[in-house]
Amino acid sequence: MALGIRCFRLLHPAFSSYLADLSRPVSEVPMKTVRGRQRDHIQYSAHPAVPVRQFATKKAKAKGKGQPQARVNINTALVEDIISLEEVDEDMKSVMEALKDNFNKTLNIRTAPGSLDHITVVTADGKLALNQIGQISMKSPQLILVNMASFPECTAAAIKAIRESGMNLNPEVEGTLIRVPIPKVTREHREMLVKLAKQNTNKAKENLRKVRTNAMNKLKKSKDKTSEDTIRLIEKQISQMADDTVAELDRHLAAKTKELLG
């Protein structure tokens, strides 16, 4: 018998610890509670308790983490008396479209006359687009001309606006004629355009946050006459819309960056 136990202990080291517990007095052995099936009474078994938590896996501990959040899809007609989600959606889309427009008109490898059209010029009459006060034309592939003969008093302001447009342009003036040499496409120029694209994207995200904040503030005004569950659901919908727009902004930035860097 002793020889058999010795052999088993060699084969299964864990059993050695178990036998040691069995050799201890009953009073020293942790007791495990077992509820009887036939009668509703408590029985006790004198065998060592096994700490179950030792068998927990990292996968089990991580359960619930990183799980995708359930998306919300509210019928806008049902909550239009609380807030117009369609208007919120339109405002967020406007932010997206403004960034696309900015990318297309100002962030191009090759400078074209059309890229100068919407440069904002600060005049005595307010802010005006450059093409409203000057005639823009392409003199050669390396030179753009801006004729300010119709608004000569705005020539200095136009030069300042072109120089500060972020397009790496250094205009020269001859009377009321502004000459804009087109810079060569260098690696530094490409990287500068990418930097501008990131700055414009961050500004778009700031505008998006304002849209979201305004929507949330408007929603708060309805808390007294709307259930908490409904308010919470609408808040989640608005946040979801904002997150989707941010993701789209990032996708356009990535695409523009790839285009600019070649």
From Swiss-Prot:
The keyword Coiled coil does not apply. Its main location: mitochondrion. PANTHER family: RIBOSOME RECYCLING FACTOR, RIBOSOME-RECYCLING FACTOR, MITOCHONDRIAL. Residues 1-55 form a transit peptide. This is Ribosome-recycling factor, mitochondrial. Responsible for the disassembly of ribosomes from messenger RNA at the termination of mitochondrial protein biosynthesis. Acts in collaboration with GFM2. Promotes mitochondrial ribosome recycling by dissolution of intersubunit contacts. It comes from Rattus norvegicus. The gene is Mrrf. Pfam families: RRF.
